[in-house]
Regions:
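A polyanion-binding, active-site-adjacent surface
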Residues: 1-106, 112-121
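Conserved small/polar residues in nucleotide/adenosyl-binding loops
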Residues: 124-126
Length: 126
């Protein structure tokens, strides 16, 4: 199962990944691999301090303070390691349900696989 989405009533942009990596699943939160550049990049864009790797609450607060939402395109899948190329047996997350709950105006896919899955399976266009 994927992680719960991070969003609130002020979320205007949704960032979609594909599926949590093994390190992210180990940490129980998005982009948990120490070499992943997501959190340093987001901190630079928002002029926030880079949150500690283990500080899940600080990461959630950066997302929410800046009107963002964070989720993955897949609820379940079969995957070998962290290779998006090996993904099969996909079950998409209910992205339409999330969009009905929050005033999302834009969706940004964090990679080619997330974009391909979002456009193929969700059939949602903002």
């Amino acid at each position: 199962m994927s992680f719960a989405p991070v969003y609130n009533a002020h979320s205007r942009a949704l960032i979609l990944g594909t599926w949590p990596s093994p390190k992210s699943r180990e940490m129980a939160f998005y982009y948990g691999h120490p070499q992943n550049r997501f959190w340093p990049m987001l901190a630079a864009l928002t002029r926030e301090a880079v949150p500690a790797r283990e500080d899940i609450e600080a990461k959630k607060q950066i997302i929410l303070r800046h009107g963002l939402a964070l989720w993955d395109t897949l609820e379940r899948c079969t995957i070998t390691g962290a290779s998006d190329a090996s993904i099969r047996d996909v079950v998409p997350n209910d992205i339409a349900g999330l969009l009905a709950k929050a005033p999302i105006e834009a969706v940004f896919c964090n990679g080619a696989a997330a974009y391909r899955i979002y456009t193929k399976l969700s059939l949602i266009h903002i």
